[in-house]
């Protein structure tokens, strides 16, 4: 099989060699990470040490941003716990040393969140434009992150523009939304030229969605053979994703709900669902990683406790709640694997 590492690597090599479309054997994924990787190849050659070094630096910087976020929303103790938990989380460290976009998306998630809470403190023209461009990169990295957009709009309206007059609001929305949407154009054009049709950044959405939304789905992992067997057994080949879901809900609503429950269960527990690689192979063959934090359930449990304890200050943590719910849904609505959970 052709793994995602190879596709990102080949697309990056082609971009560094002059192919502005960064084509690869499989072009179904959002091309942003290929351009990030290709820029490194262009500057340093196909140097994996440069790639991993930059991704490790982004991880370290993300830890600092998490400290600042925790301190800003709660206090320095919470900030330090967030810093320590993220910087010593073995799964994140593993993905920082791999040519996959998991750590890249995680960094953009953290930076975009930090930019938004800073925007509330200093909503200058430069901050509005900068925040919009950071959000644009976050959304383009994986389109299911667009689930956050309605809540971002609500946050800006309710908390950033709260005391602004009508004319100021109009100007503010222009400074925020125009750069946000205009910055989508280059990648949308790239996707159109590569696929010969309009593609909203990522054409893998339908298969990623159906592969995790059939009644026999175990709740974790990605296996198209299981999906094909189910479709053939129930004569559901060739259906659109919505029709595929509708027929299952109508024929076995209880079974469909049980499948959703399994996905939620496996999302919050310790099992690291394999996708392109197994986290457990790295843990077994490393002398350091097993001594770091390697239990996702620890983070999910602390996160759920934090939600309950901070509910009285929900205005202060509105954006945190919104990001948390949207990032959980961005995984659970599709399929649950290790690398999708990190952000």
For each feature predicted by the language model, list its residue ranges.
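Extracytoplasmic catalytic/substrate-binding loops of multi-pass membrane glycan-assembly enzymes
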Residues: 1-11, 24-36, 45-49, 198-202, ...
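Lumenal/periplasmic acceptor-binding loop at the mouth of the active site in multi-pass
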Residues: 17-20, 223-307
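Juxtamembrane membrane-water interface segments immediately following transmembrane helices
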Residues: 1-22, 172-236
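Perimembrane helix-loop-helix junctions
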Residues: 118-120, 126, 148-181, 188-189
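Transmembrane-helix motifs of polytopic, lipid-linked glycan transferases
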Residues: 53-74, 110-111, 115, 301-308
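Transmembrane-helix signature of polytopic, membrane-embedded enzymes
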Residues: 61-88, 106-107, 121-128, 314-322
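Membrane-interface transmembrane helices that cradle and orient dolichyl/undecaprenyl
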Residues: 76, 112-130, 138, 156-164, ...
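Multi-pass, polyprenyl lipid-linked donor-dependent membrane glycosyltransferases
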Residues: 3, 28, 32-33, 51-58, ...
């Amino acid at each position: 099989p052709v793994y995602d590492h190879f596709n990102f690597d080949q697309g990056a090599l082609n971009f560094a060699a002059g192919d502005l479309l960064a084509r690869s054997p499989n072009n179904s994924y959002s091309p942003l990470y290929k351009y990030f990787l290709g820029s490194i190849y262009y500057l340093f050659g196909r140097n994996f040490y440069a790639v991993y070094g930059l991704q490790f630096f982004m991880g370290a910087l993300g830890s600092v941003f998490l400290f600042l976020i925790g301190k800003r929303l709660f206090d320095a103790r919470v900030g330090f716990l967030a810093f320590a938990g993220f910087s010593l989380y073995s799964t994140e460290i593993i993905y920082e040393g791999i040519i996959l976009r998991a750590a890249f998306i995680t960094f953009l998630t953290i930076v975009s969140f930090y930019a938004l809470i800073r925007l509330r403190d200093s909503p200058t023209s430069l901050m509005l434009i900068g925040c919009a461009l950071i959000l644009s990169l976050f959304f383009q990295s994986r389109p299911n992150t667009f689930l956050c957009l309605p809540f971002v709009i609500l946050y800006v309206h309710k908390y950033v523009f709260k005391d602004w007059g009508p004319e100021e609001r109009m100007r503010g929305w222009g400074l925020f939304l125009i750069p946000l949407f205009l910055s989508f154009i280059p990648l949308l054009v790239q996707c159109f030229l590569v696929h010969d049709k309009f593609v909203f950044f990522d054409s893998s959405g339908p298969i990623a969605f159906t592969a995790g939304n059939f009644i026999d789905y175990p709740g974790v992992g990605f296996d198209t053979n299981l999906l094909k067997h189910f479709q053939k057994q129930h004569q559901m080949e060739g259906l659109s994703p919505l029709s595929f879901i509708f027929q299952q809900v109508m024929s076995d609503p209880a079974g469909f709900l049980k499948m959703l429950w399994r996905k939620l269960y496996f999302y919050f527990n310790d099992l690291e669902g394999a996708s392109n690689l197994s986290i457990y192979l790295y843990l077994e063959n490393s002398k350091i990683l097993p001594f770091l934090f390697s239990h996702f359930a620890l983070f999910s449990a602390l996160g759920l406790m934090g939600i309950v304890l901070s509910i009285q200050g929900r205005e202060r943590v509105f954006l945190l709640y919104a990001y948390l719910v949207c990032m959980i849904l961005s995984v659970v609505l599709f399929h649950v694997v290790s690398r999708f959970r990190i952000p």
